[in-house]
Amino acid sequence: MRAVVQRVSRGEVSVGGEMVSSIGKGFVVLVGISIDDNENDVMYMADKIVNLRVFEDEEGKMNLSLLDIGGEVLLVSQFTLLGDVRKGRRPNFMMAQKPQEALKYFNLLVKEIEKRGVSVKTGIFQAMMKVLIENDGPVTILIDSKKVF
């Protein structure tokens, strides 16, 4: 499981010109689910997202988590994060999970983040979305549950 975590002052998802989800301060998380992901990857990712300390404390130091600031998550499925461009010029998406299985893990990730005390909004799975990301910083963190980077 791979995620791009962006600290935001706000985020929105629109489908077909209509806003379907929005958050204030927190994270917009773009997540790609791999063919070899399982529940352990979901738990790892949920813990990292909820406890990542990238919000500034009273001294300006990145020391606070979503839990500490009462932040929200806008979780957006993005299979293209699994694209392999090592060969050729067109991405190979062979490592991306099939949609039905990916949706199962995506929904589990939503539940696990919420279970840890953070509000989660989502885009619409498999829809063509417009994602508004108002970066705060900017602060962008890459997380891979297989610890590839």
Curated annotation (Swiss-Prot):
Chain positions of motif Gly-cisPro motif, important for rejection of L-amino acids: 137-138
This protein's UniProt keywords: Cytoplasm, Hydrolase, RNA-binding, tRNA-binding
GO BP, one annotated term: D-amino acid catabolic process
Main location: cytoplasm
Entry keyword Cytoplasm: yes
Gene Ontology CC annotations of this record: cytoplasm
Catalysed reaction equations from the record: glycyl-tRNA(Ala) + H2O = tRNA(Ala) + glycine + H(+); a D-aminoacyl-tRNA + H2O = a tRNA + a D-alpha-amino acid + H(+)
Alphabetized GO MF terms: D-tyrosyl-tRNA(Tyr) deacylase activity; Gly-tRNA(Ala) deacylase activity; Ser(Gly)-tRNA(Ala) hydrolase activity; tRNA binding
Comment on protein domains: A Gly-cisPro motif from one monomer fits into the active site of the other monomer to allow specific chiral rejection of L-amino acids.
SUBUNIT field: Homodimer.
Name used for this protein in its record: D-aminoacyl-tRNA deacylase
Organism, scientific name: Thermoanaerobacter pseudethanolicus (strain ATCC 33223 / 39E) (Clostridium thermohydrosulfuricum)
